[in-house]
């Protein structure tokens, strides 16, 4: 059994597959109907209008409807698109067992405990026929898939087949009056719309289920006598064919498989049994430990079954549908049915080669799993799971292609896997001894070789090499030298796909794709939410793969995207250009044409083939917000500008790429204050004073404008601004501008007009304006302020700018490949100076006669004018020199030695050497490459919030450098401090940088944290544990054992941080006793040291006991007693248990179930029970509810929840 989907719920009593979509309906004993997407594993909807258990449910074949019947005697018809019940059919007088739509007519058949079967017309919403005859509960009833028959099973120990041909004729409009009269009579006097055709007797006890065969005249039934019976019928009679025995309890449901000649039954003996319908023998049995099975459903089109049991349901397949295939150049060998087939890609010719299995061999779950081909010897190895793993070796005759009558005896053997490793050698895995047998084509053992790891499968990895798979890693093993060539930690690998040049390999797990080099050096990891099915490399080195419902691509750097969606899963065999060749589940070859433009464009960007990028921009229809976001994310905003029409997005991209001209054009179109402000900030950063001035004018930001005029020495406009402030009656602005201008008289005048006569007098006196000072003194009279004597006053004048006007000089760089396209696409980016002046003057009542440096039009035109100088020397600014003719230039002799001193070239700084050689974040930070360190931590651990690490980065950098002071006129000499330095060290070999953090420090902090926890200093303990979590990414250890210890420390500290956060939260919530109890309860489920767990249990027991939740307190008390507490604690716990046994109740209901295993969400502090979806922090592994995905982890305060990360890298031994 291959379980595809499983749910946990109340007992499932009814199941129905949707005929087209990957949906299944499950009706529960609790009265809820669940609609699941079994492919994605998600609950789509739930319907809960029934009162009591719902035992029957069924999808309509073509309409968006389903029907349900329950113990409330009601049949409800639902529209799942509108999420509501359309109507209810009433008529049954007891529990309804099953309901089913007719495949063609608007009928529903229902079986009930009122001993009747009813047929309803769901369009007219009436009962059209009542089938009576059973004298006990009718357990099931169903329509025949093609004929006018109904089969029913009852506890009266019979199976009945009913003929409803008359009902069909009655439903079809009568052709003449005689027929109409007959129908009227039957309506008046009780007609015979349905008659019993056969009564099948043979079961000794009540029959629970009966079902028709989809195509043959067969019926299968299951009963409380633990037997499954097979019946055959013809036009006149029906008889028992055989009885299938094996179930140990009541058979609850039995079905024919839709595609295979088998019968599937389930029973209250907790088993599902699979029977051969032809031989009537048991093939397989699947058991559950605690759950009885109640219902089966078979998908009408696909190889899927579903079974409902006491605690949920499972969707499963009986055998794999992936065809075994092997690629060889332009051809494909694959196994289908009983033949090995050959497919040629160039001609798309498909032919049979040889039979590979004798007819009549049981084929269930024994189809070929893998296929390996040797082109030189024309030999094929086919592996299957038969007998615990076996292989068959066939030598294909050269003239057998196209013929299928060449029968040969295959050479067989047992082994977990078998693959060709050389021209005439193949390797077979012996799982029991974990060794490989190398055999020749005569199936003789040539060599035995033990494997370096416990291996459960082997794959081809080049001539003489094997890729060995264990549960958590893969290794490449050289059989000749018996050496491990590469090793990589991976999830459980299912398939291995090598590129055509054998330089790259894709390792496919259930939900992960790992791209690595031929030596298993990790290149990128990709995670998928739904199952990965297959993959192949295209000609450009892009990995194309399929999931259950998509064809996707993966670039060499790990970027991925969707190429197209799929209706059914496919298995890619080859990618050639824009064509994907694949096999479907029926073993048919298909060629699918795809649009590869998107990933080729991204690949060209990645490989910096900008000529291709430019060509694709001009010729392709690349568009969409996703492409713009990708280009922006990858640092190509200037490319993204080509795809954007929206002015706001263009403005943002232009600012990001520093393209001021496009930004001005977009800001003019948008004309909003915020955009002008941001434009001013960017223009100021670039030193473009003209644009800065223009932006400040548009936002009427006079303070910034006056300061700009001050620092650029534009005193004329500064004086105009002062007049504007005077007109606007802005005293402070007027005074500021006067101060900037150094205009003392104006300042005295402003102070006098503002009524500050003492200040005006002091200003005039200090600056030597005696006439004005005397006049003001007269006005002040006796209130003249006294000035200090003996001080020599100096005039406060603003400094004169050294460089007045002009933009900052910018380095001239080569014109970017993408700039030409932008300039040619003129978007009206120039701003008319007359318009600017008009707005400026109208608003400020003053005429500004142009900008000093250059107007906007000149600015935008200058760049184009400068770039049009395309003569060879124009860009260099070289001039022709007129030299006097009498000065001959002397020629230097060949052996003349120059007396000019040549400075030796500067060597590489040590920090740069460290940065280039290391891939550890701590060493990058010590070298001063903070940006690289942050990128590494983001890629390895998903860290995004680097604020807690800032001080540590600086400590690492300072700790690895020392500075020697020389003469006062000389700069200090920096010295690099290396790790493990000694006097015998070679001066030319650089060791890694010395690090201020090591693992022993963390051990000391951990002990301090334990001590603080024990003494109840939770805030201090939390600080210490968080400090450990923040330090671990920047610690370097030497051995693999120490790496494991570091990873173990992360888990330990994470548990304490989460627990302490909950405890501190609990202490804050004094007004919410229920939440206090919940948080105390969750704290006890953190993985703590025994003394701390004991204290947490004691605390939770006390809180719950005080709240009179005695049952919950009793649970904590029992757990406390299991930890061997001290006498006083044990005595208290026993007293709580005794008190609870007298009254085992809880006064308040808590969101806490100690019987159901759970983890606690690190953000919301609610339990996530086993089976519920969650997301985790890639660094500290704390678990969260799904809606927290994308937020910063609240436990470690570093990583992004749910982010993809390759894992902690803290040792050079992990890199080797």
Swiss-Prot record:
Signal peptide: none
Residues in WD repeats: 7-48, 49-88, 91-132, 133-172, 202-241, 246-285, 288-326, 363-404
Kinase found in the keyword field: no
Gene Ontology cellular component annotations, sorted alphabetically: COPI vesicle coat; Golgi membrane; nucleus; plasma membrane
A Pfam family per the record: COPI_C
PROSITE patterns the UniProt entry points to: WD_REPEATS_1, WD_REPEATS_2, WD_REPEATS_REGION
Keyword annotations from UniProtKB, A to Z: Cytoplasm, Cytoplasmic vesicle, ER-Golgi transport, Golgi apparatus, Membrane, Protein transport, Repeat, Transport, WD repeat
Cited function: The coatomer is a cytosolic protein complex that binds to dilysine motifs and reversibly associates with Golgi non-clathrin-coated vesicles, which further mediate biosynthetic protein transport from the ER, via the Golgi up to the trans Golgi network. Coatomer complex is required for budding from Golgi membranes, and is essential for the retrograde Golgi-to-ER transport of dilysine-tagged proteins.
Subunit note: Oligomeric complex that consists of at least the alpha, beta, beta', gamma, delta, epsilon and zeta subunits.
PANTHER family: COATOMER, COATOMER SUBUNIT ALPHA
Name by which UniProt lists this protein: Coatomer subunit alpha-1
UniProt source species: Arabidopsis thaliana
């Amino acid at each position: 059994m291959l379980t595809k989907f499983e749910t946990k719920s109340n007992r499932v009593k009814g199941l129905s597959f949707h005929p087209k979509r990957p949906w299944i309906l499950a009706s529960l004993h609790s009265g809820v109907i669940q609609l699941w997407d079994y492919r994605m594993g998600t609950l789509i909807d739930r319907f809960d209008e029934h009162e009591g258990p719902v035992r029957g449910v069924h999808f309509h074949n073509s309409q968006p409807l389903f029907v349900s019947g329950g113990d409330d005697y009601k049949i409800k018809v639902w529209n799942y698109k509108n999420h509501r019940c359309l109507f209810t059919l009433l008529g049954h007088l007891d529990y309804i067992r099953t309901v089913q739509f007719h495949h063609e007519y608007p009928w529903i058949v229902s079986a009930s405990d009122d001993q009747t079967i009813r047929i309803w017309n769901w369009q007219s919403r009436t009962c059209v026929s009542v089938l009576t005859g059973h004298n006990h509960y009718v357990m099931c009833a169903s329509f025949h898939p093609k004929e006018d028959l109904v089969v029913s099973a009852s506890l009266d120990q019979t199976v009945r087949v009913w003929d409803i041909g008359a009902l069909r004729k009655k439903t079809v409009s009568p052709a003449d009056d005689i027929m109409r009269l007959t129908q009227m009579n039957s309506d008046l006097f009780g007609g015979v719309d349905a008659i019993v055709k056969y009564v099948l007797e043979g079961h000794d006890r009540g029959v629970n289920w009966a079902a028709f065969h989809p195509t043959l005249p067969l019926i299968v039934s299951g009963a409380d006598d633990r037997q499954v019976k097979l019946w055959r019928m013809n036009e006149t009679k029906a008889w028992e064919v055989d009885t299938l025995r094996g179930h140990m309890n009541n058979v609850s449901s039995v079905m024919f498989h839709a595609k295979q000649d088998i019968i599937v039954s389930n029973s209250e003996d907790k088993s599902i049994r699979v029977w051969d319908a032809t031989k009537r023998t048991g093939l397989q049995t699947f058991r559950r430990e605690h759950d009885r099975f109640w219902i089966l459903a078979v998908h009408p089109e696909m190889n899927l079954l579903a079974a409902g049991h006491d605690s949920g349901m499972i969707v499963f397949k009986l055998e794999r549908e992936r065809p075994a295939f092997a690629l060889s150049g332009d051809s494909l060998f694959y196994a289908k049915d009983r033949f090995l087939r050959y497919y040629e890609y160039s001609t798309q010719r498909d032919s049979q080669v040889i039979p590979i299995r004798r007819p009549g061999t049981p084929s269930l779950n024994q189809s070929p799993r893998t296929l390996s081909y040797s082109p030189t010897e024309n030999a094929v190895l086919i592996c299957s799971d038969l007998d615990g793993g076996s292989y068959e070796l066939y030598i294909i005759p050269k003239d057998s292609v196209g013929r299928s009558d060449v029968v040969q005896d295959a050479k067989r053997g047992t082994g977990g896997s078998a693959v060709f490793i050389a021209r005439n050698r193949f390797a077979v895995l012996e799982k029991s001894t974990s060794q490989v047998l190398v055999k020749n084509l005569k199936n003789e053992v040539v060599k035995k070789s033990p494997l370096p790891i416990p291996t459960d499968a082997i794959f081809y990895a080049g001539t003489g090499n094997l890729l060995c798979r264990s549960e958590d890693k893969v290794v490449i093993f050289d059989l000749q030298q018996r050496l491990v060539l590469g090793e990589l930690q991976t999830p459980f690998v299912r398939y291995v796909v090598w590129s055509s040049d054998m330089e790259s390999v894709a390792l496919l797990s259930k939900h992960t794709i790992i791209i690595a080099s031929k030596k298993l050096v990790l290149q990128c990891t990709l995670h998928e939410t739904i199952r990965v099915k297959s993959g192949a490399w295209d000609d450009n080195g892009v990995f194309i793969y399929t999931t259950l419902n998509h064809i996707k691509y993966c670039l060499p750097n790990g970027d991925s995207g969707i190429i197209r969606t799929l209706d059914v899963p496919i298995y890619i065999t080859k990618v050639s250009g824009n064509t994907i060749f694949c096999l479907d589940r029926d073993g048919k070859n298909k060629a699918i044409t795809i649009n590869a433009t998107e990933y080729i464009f991204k690949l060209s960007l990645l490989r910096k083939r900008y000529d291709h990028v430019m060509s694709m921009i001009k010729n392709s229809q690349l568009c969409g917000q996703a492409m713009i976001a990708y280009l922006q994310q990858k640092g190509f905003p200037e490319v993204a500008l080509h795809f954007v029409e929206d002015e706001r997005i263009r403005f943002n991209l232009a600012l990001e790429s520093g393209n001021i001209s496009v930004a001005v054009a977009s800001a003019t179109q948008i004309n909003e204050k915020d955009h002008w402000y941001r434009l001013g900030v960017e223009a100021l950063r670039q030193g473009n004073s003209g644009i800065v001035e223009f932006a400040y004018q548009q936002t009427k930001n006079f303070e910034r404008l006056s300061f700009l005029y001050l620092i650029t020495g534009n005193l004329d406009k500064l004086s105009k601004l002062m007049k504007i402030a005077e007109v606007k009656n802005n005293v402070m602005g007027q005074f500021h501008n006067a101060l900037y201008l150094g205009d003392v008289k104006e300042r005295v005048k402003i102070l006098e007009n503002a009524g500050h006569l003492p200040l005006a007098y002091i200003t005039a006196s200090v600056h030597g304006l005696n006439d004005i000072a005397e006049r003001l003194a007269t006005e002040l009279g006796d209130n003249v302020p006294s000035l200090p004597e003996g001080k020599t006053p100096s005039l406060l004048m603003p400094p004169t700018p050294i460089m007045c006007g002009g933009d900052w000089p910018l380095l001239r760089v080569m014109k970017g490949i993408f700039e030409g396209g932008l300039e040619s696409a003129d978007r009206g980016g120039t701003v008319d100076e007359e318009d600017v002046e008009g707005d400026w003057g109208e608003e400020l009542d003053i005429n500004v006669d142009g900008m000093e440096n250059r107007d906007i039009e000149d600015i935008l035109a200058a760049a184009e004018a400068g770039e049009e100088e395309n003569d060879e020397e124009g860009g260099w600014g070289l001039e022709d020199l007129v030299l006097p003719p009498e000065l001959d230039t002397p020629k230097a002799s060949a052996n003349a030695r120059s007396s000019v001193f040549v400075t030796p070239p500067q060597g590489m700084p040590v920090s740069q050497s460290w940065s280039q050689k290391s891939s550890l974040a701590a060493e990058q930070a010590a070298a001063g490459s903070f940006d690289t360190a942050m990128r590494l931590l983001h890629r390895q651990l998903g860290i995004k919030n680097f604020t807690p690490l800032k001080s540590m980065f600086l400590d690492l950098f300072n700790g690895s450098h020392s500075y020697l002071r020389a003469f006062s006129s000389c700069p200090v000499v920096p010295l690099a401090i290396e790790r493990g330095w000694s006097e015998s060290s070679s001066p030319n070999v650089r060791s890694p940088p010395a690090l201020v953090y090591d693992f022993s420090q963390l051990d000391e902090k951990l002990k301090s944290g334990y001590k603080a926890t024990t003494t109840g200093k939770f805030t201090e303990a939390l600080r210490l544990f968080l400090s450990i979590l923040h330090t671990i990414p920047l610690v370097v250890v030497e051995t693999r054992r120490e790496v494991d210890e570091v990873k173990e420390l992360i888990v330990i500290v994470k548990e304490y941080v989460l627990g302490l956060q909950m405890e501190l939260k609990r202490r804050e919530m004094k007004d919410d006793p229920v939440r206090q109890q919940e948080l105390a309860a969750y704290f006890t489920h953190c993985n703590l040291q025994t003394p701390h767990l004991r204290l947490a249990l004691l605390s939770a027991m006390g809180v719950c006991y005080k709240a009179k939740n005695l049952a919950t307190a009793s649970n904590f008390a029992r757990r406390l007693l299991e930890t061997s507490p001290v006498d006083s604690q044990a005595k208290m716990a026993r007293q709580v248990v005794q008190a609870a046994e007298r009254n085992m109740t809880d006064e308040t209901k808590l969101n806490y179930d100690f019987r159901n295993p759970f983890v606690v969400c690190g953000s919301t502090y609610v339990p996530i029970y086993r089976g519920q979806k969650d997301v985790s922090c890639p660094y500290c592994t704390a678990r969260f509810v799904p809606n927290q995905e994308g937020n910063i982890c609240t436990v470690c305060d570093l990583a992004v929840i749910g982010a993809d990360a390759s894992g902690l890298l803290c040792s050079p031994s992990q890199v080797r």
